[in-house]
Amino acid sequence: MTAARGKFRFGVTLLAPASRAEWVRKCRRAEELGYDVVGVADHLGLPAPFPAMILAAEATERVRLTTFVLNTPFYNAVLLAREAATADQLTDGRVELGLGAGYVREEFETAGITFESAGKRVEQLATTAATLRRLFADPEYQPRPVQPAGPPLVIAGWGDRLLRVAADHADVIALPGAAPAYNGGPLQFVGRDATDARMAYLRELLGARAEAVELNILLQRVIPPEERSAALELYGPHLPADVADRPEELPALLIGTPKEMARQLEERRERFGFSYVTVLESSMEPMGEVIELLR
């Protein structure tokens, strides 16, 4: 967990399918706006992560590239290590490898992969993370990643089991701040009090590693003042009680002018330790103004 006043990093996860030319344009635009990381999601119907990352590297000069995040049970760990190491070679060491346990049952069924219990999927993630660490630590391993220890591991999660795995293996821990309802309903946001409790639990798990691990928060939306009323109408019934009348305080939303949003992010870095902030593609442009203020 990086120091509360650590330097910000900003990422954007690109979700919309695109032609080659459009993909190149979007990646270059992200770099122009000041983003540090371009992320590629791992859902059926979207571009395959590793080819998309390699093209993103060819189209840009400095941004790092991440899977944000893989459905880890889709992948054999040894073959995933080869994919990640090759991508790291071909991007000159710009890859970060994001891992998640997977949560969309329909995608598993479509792919013909058993949708195991949550506990089993977390075990699969833990085994994969340990295998990646072991292989990349072997000086004889080929293909050799450019980064000496291999691509940094980003592990996403919120629950106790996933955070225990992340505390053991991750260089970056990504927290969602919101999750889809199990019945397919609107996002269920997490308030400040619940986030405080998660951070306390995570600090305990990390122990001496706390200052070395970077914390990421995924912002579900960046909402300018003129869209506040519509956003409240959409999200209001599903907000936690401690911020029901103050949605600006939700860790997974940004609401206000660019200056107000910048201040909110500084406050969250101070309170929770979130120094790495990711937005979805739909928020890429408005977030650019906030990034400029925080450089």
What do the predicted segments below correspond to?
Residues 1-295:
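Active-site-adjacent structural elements that line small-molecule/cofactor binding pockets in enzymes
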